[in-house]
């Protein structure tokens, strides 16, 4: 599907204009800031649109898009106005405009975000105008993708500076001078992206950290040994990695601190001042170029990359290394360095909340900008219908915005329906009755994979489905209503299982194995490297090592016996099942994004908090049309205090769609999908008949309560609503 757009009457093309934000608008009042909004007009066509008004700011953010039908000779005028003044007189409140002529439109479409300087409506106007507006023009087939590089200078009537964005996740205020993406002799970008060198007006020499942390931007690791241009470079200092962006720009990452830099750490900074003419010719396949500001960079046509470091300096370093050993190690980049070539990254923190924010940001960069992951199921057949629909989809489709609908119900999913779907689905797919999982022991109700699940011939496909559901929940910020064993989370992280992990799963076996390690077993035990287990009523034997039934356990080899026993206990008959589940999980959550977490943290990310802190709940509740001293509020909390843990969880599920609490607590409850921030639990006093039951709005975490006359009536109605009702509707 590569049609250029949707045409109307054969003479116009459909273009989606996105007005992202404006920067540094003129302040024309001494005591107050303007309320800016943008107006979009397709000149001569009658098409006119206005953005929302943003209050009291010189840097409004709109991020709104409009579909325009533009003819071959049409132009687009985008003007910014102060809503506080537009009613006073004609022309009042004008803050600047930009006009795109027809040739500018054809050249700017599908080139990413552009930052355009605002200008006066007429050159003779005396009012001061300043600032920029950030917009993009996309045809239908390119929405969500990047375009080719174009030279935008001279196309705009106001001749504003054009800034191109490298992708949807990169803010335009965080650009820096960087080596240009690799281009061949024709000037076409090798990476297929739309990022080229842009010189920031502030000359701020920093690159956005997210861009280098984005898994889509990281290129394969290139070592100097596999470069084909004939010269050998010294090894990188310990802790450094050489990486390449998708545009072919080489940078260096210090893995311990997370600091990135364009400067090659193998080259002392004083060598960069050497006269290029004194270094001799460039290696074969290399070319020297300069940025718009005159800074030199080097193009490697062999590897299709660009860099600031002169490749000839490696030859000097090799020669010096042959003459003498370095007297001191290379200096590591400092955490707070503000040198112009260093790319400061966020400090690595053990704080789980901070690491979770980084994970959420990385996942948001992978979410497609258009389309939905639509799932429609019935409550009666939720497991099988969800399985069939999820397994038909591609992983990239599952990353689109999640929209769930229960058949026969009219509820609109802005997050609440999806949370209830996951809650109900987990009760089915994790139920030991279905044979996929089992409890770790008879009296410990954490879940582990059932080694006898192969009784279902399609069990591997179902484990793949379970992995996808777990990944889907994490990707979209929801939680799985079920607890697995700690070793299960360690296996998901690729970490080895240890004897200490057995204590929480099988305390008796752990106690026995610890006794073996701590005591002399020679006169006591007569074991071999062969163990027995029960499978469908039959006693089967398993050799822990080849010919294990003939190898006795002694003081010398008992540590090996315990290690092999522990590994067998956790992986007995579940290797294929676990690999299928892990495959489904990693289709949505790449393995490298999980490296900063340990098993306890991963458990919280997947399952959230299962314990409800009543004080935290109370202190992070919003009241609407009532106050803390209102009878309804006091009676509500009195009722909650009388509930046991199970009923409190059911109440939370009734109002929010989930029994789980975010790891930050109730202050981080998520509301409607795509909301800018959390949405607190809300008690809303409504004017309604007191014979009605309380109503819940799961997308807004809100419960509507009529003005009941007594505590007893509120308790009865609330309990009935929580225990006896289900389903969604639209008011």
UniProtKB/Swiss-Prot annotation:
Primary residence: cytoplasm
Domain WW residue range list: 234-267, 280-313
EC number: 2.3.2.26
PROSITE patterns assigned: C2, HECT, WW_DOMAIN_1, WW_DOMAIN_2
Top-level EC class: transferase
Pathway: Protein modification; protein ubiquitination
Domain C2: 1-120
Catalytically driven reaction(s): S-ubiquitinyl-[E2 ubiquitin-conjugating enzyme]-L-cysteine + [acceptor protein]-L-lysine = [E2 ubiquitin-conjugating enzyme]-L-cysteine + N(6)-ubiquitinyl-[acceptor protein]-L-lysine
SUPFAM superfamilies registered for this protein in UniProt: C2 domain (Calcium/lipid-binding domain, CaLB), Hect, E3 ligase catalytic domain, WW domain
Matches recorded under Pfam families: C2, HECT, WW
Post-translational modifications reported in the UniProt record: Auto-ubiquitinated in presence of NDFIP1. Ubiquitinated by the SCF(FBXL15) complex at Lys-355 and Lys-357, leading to its degradation by the proteasome. Lys-357 is the primary ubiquitination site.
Transmembrane segments: none
Membrane topology: Peripheral membrane protein
Active site annotation, chain numbering: 699
Coiled-coil intervals, chain numbering: none
Positions of the UniProt region annotated as Disordered: 216-237
GO molecular function: ubiquitin protein ligase activity; ubiquitin-protein transferase activity
Comment on protein domains: The C2 domain mediates membrane localization and substrate selection.
Name the record gives this protein: E3 ubiquitin-protein ligase SMURF1
């Amino acid at each position: 599907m590569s049609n250029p757009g949707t045409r109307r009457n054969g003479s116009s093309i459909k273009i989606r204009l996105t007005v992202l934000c404006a920067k540094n608008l003129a302040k024309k009042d001494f005591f107050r800031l303007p309320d800016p909004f943008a107006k979009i007009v397709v000149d001569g066509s009658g098409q006119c649109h206005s953005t929302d008004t943003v209050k009291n700011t010189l840097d409004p953010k709109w991020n709104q898009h409009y579909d325009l039908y533009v003819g071959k000779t049409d132009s687009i005028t985008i003007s910014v106005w102060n809503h506080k003044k537009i009613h006073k007189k004609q022309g009042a409140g004008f803050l600047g405009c930009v006009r795109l002529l027809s040739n500018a439109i054809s050249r700017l479409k599908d080139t990413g975000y552009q930052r355009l300087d605002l200008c006066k409506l007429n050159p003779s106007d005396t009012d001061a105008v300043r600032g920029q507006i950030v917009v993009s023009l996309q045809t239908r087939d390119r929405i969500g993708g990047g375009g080719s590089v174009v030279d935008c200078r001279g196309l705009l009537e106001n001749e504003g500076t054009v800034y191109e964005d490298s992708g949807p996740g990169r803010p335009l205020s965080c650009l820096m001078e960087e080596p240009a993406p690799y281009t061949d002799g024709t000037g076409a970008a090798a990476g297929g992206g739309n990022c080229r060198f842009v010189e920031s007006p502030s000359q701020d020499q920093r690159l956005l950290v997210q861009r280098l942390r984005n898994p889509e931007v990281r290129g394969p690791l290139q070592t100097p040994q596999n470069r084909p241009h004939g010269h050998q470079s010294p090894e990188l200092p310990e802790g450094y990695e050489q990486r390449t962006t998708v545009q072919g720009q080489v940078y260096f990452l210090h893995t311990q601190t997370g600091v990135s830099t364009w400067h090659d750490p193998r080259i002392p900074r004083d060598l960069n001042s050497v006269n290029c003419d004194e270094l001799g010719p460039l290696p074969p396949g290399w070319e020297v170029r300069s940025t718009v500001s005159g800074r030199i960079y080097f193009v490697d046509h062999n590897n299709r990359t660009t860099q600031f470091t002169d490749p000839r300096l490696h030859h000097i370093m090799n020669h010096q290394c042959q003459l003498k050993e370095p007297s001191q190690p290379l200096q590591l980049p400092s955490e707070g360095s503000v040198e112009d070539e260093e790319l400061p990254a966020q400090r690595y923190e053990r704080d789980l909340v901070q690491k979770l924010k980084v994970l959420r940001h990385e996942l948001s960069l992978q979410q497609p900008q258009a389309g939905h992951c639509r799932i429609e199921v019935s409550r009666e057949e939720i497991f099988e219908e969800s399985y069939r629909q999820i397994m038909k989809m591609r992983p990239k489709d599952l990353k689109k915005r999640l929209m769930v609908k229960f058949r026969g119900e009219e509820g609109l999913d802005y997050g609440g329906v999806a949370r209830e779907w996951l809650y109900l689905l987990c009760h089915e797919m994790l139920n030991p009755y279905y044979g996929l999982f089992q409890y770790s022991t008879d009296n410990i109700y954490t879940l582990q994979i059932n080694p006898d699940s192969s009784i279902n011939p399609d069990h591997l496909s179902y484990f793949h489905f379970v992995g996808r559901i777990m990944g889907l929940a994490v990707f979209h910020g929801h939680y799985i209503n079920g607890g697995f064993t700690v070793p299960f989370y360690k296996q998901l992280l690729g970490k080895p299982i240890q004897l200490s992990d057995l204590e929480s799963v099988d305390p008796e076996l752990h106690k026995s194995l610890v006794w073996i390690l701590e005591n002399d077993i020679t006169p006591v035990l007569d074991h071999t490297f062969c163990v027995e287990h029960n499978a469908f009523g039959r006693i089967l034997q398993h050799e822990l090592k080849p010919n294990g039934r003939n190898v006795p356990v002694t003081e010398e080899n008992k540590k090996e016996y315990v290690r092999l026993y522990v590994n067998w206990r956790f992986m007995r008959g579940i290797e294929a099942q676990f690999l299928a589940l892990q495959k489904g999980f990693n289709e949505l959550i790449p393995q490298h994004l999980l490296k900063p977490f340990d098993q306890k943290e991963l458990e919280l990310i997947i399952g959230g908090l299962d314990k409800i802190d009543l004080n935290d709940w109370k202190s992070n509740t919003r009241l609407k049309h009532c106050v803390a001293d209102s009878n309804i509020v006091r009676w509500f909390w009195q009722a909650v205090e009388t509930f046991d843990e199970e009923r409190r969880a059911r109440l939370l599920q009734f109002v929010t769609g989930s029994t789980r609490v975010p790891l930050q607590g109730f202050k981080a409850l998520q509301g409607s999908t795509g909301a800018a921030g959390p949405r607190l639990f809300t008690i809303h006093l409504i004017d309604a008949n007191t014979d009605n039951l309380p109503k819940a709005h799961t997308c807004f975490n809100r419960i509507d309560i009529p003005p009941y006359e007594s505590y007893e009536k509120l308790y009865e109605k609330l309990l009935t609503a929580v225990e006896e009702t289900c389903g969604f509707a639209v008011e």
